[in-house]
Regions:
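Nucleotidyltransferase catalytic core that binds NTPs
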Residues: 1-188
């Protein structure tokens, strides 16, 4: 990558945030380097699009932000925000506003994640010729796997309420005390 200021934007629901989310954020943090920045946009879904735990609990965007801040504490170039519009729309908006630099969009190689960004490179470059937009396909991350398969928020929600099973979904770099704190935050 060239020496221009690099910004990675990672939109998503992150409900609940798990080790795969952290590994993706860490990947982009390393990719943009210490002088770059990573903006993580957490969705604020409408009532019909909320993701719920088996017992019907809604995981709030505010809780997601608090947990991602804990996960990313050691990553000095990461800022987690709650998106006021759809997180993908926030990506487009930032791409239009930036004056120059290199822009990356965070996504995984899982399912349809990359498809959210099919048009973004050409769209932003046509409106902002001073910006270099990297093709999301070239920077997409592999999905984090565990012994039981791919780590997903859906599977994390399935074990919600069972602290022992929830532990396997938390980032490996967290100590046990921090993992217990995160689980307590999720279960409150």
């Amino acid at each position: 990558m060239n020496q221009e200021h690099k910004i990675a934007i990672i939109p998503g629901s992150f409900k609940p945030p798990h080790k795969g989310h952290y590994e993706m954020i860490k990947h982009y943090s390393e990719l943009v380097g210490p002088d770059g920045e990573v903006l993580v946009f957490v969705s604020k879904p409408s009532a019909k699009n909320q993701r719920k735990t088996p017992d019907g609990k809604v995981i709030s965007p505010e809780l997601v932000k608090q947990i991602l801040d804990i996960y990313c504490q050691s990553l000095g170039n990461v800022n987690v925000e709650i998106a006021q519009v759809s997180p993908v729309k926030a990506c487009y908006d930032i791409g239009e506003r930036l004056k120059s630099g290199v822009l990356l969009f965070g996504c995984s190689k899982k399912d349809d994640d990359i498809k959210r960004f099919n048009q973004i490179k050409s769209y932003i470059e046509s409106r902002n010729p001073n910006l270099i937009v990297l093709d999301p396909i070239t920077t997409a991350v592999d999905v984090t796997a565990s012994e039981d398969g791919v780590v997903s928020a859906t599977d994390f929600r399935r074990v919600y309420g069972n602290p022992e099973e929830m532990m396997q979904f938390l980032p490996d770099h967290l100590n046990d005390g921090t993992k217990h704190k995160v689980i307590q935050m999720l279960l409150q």
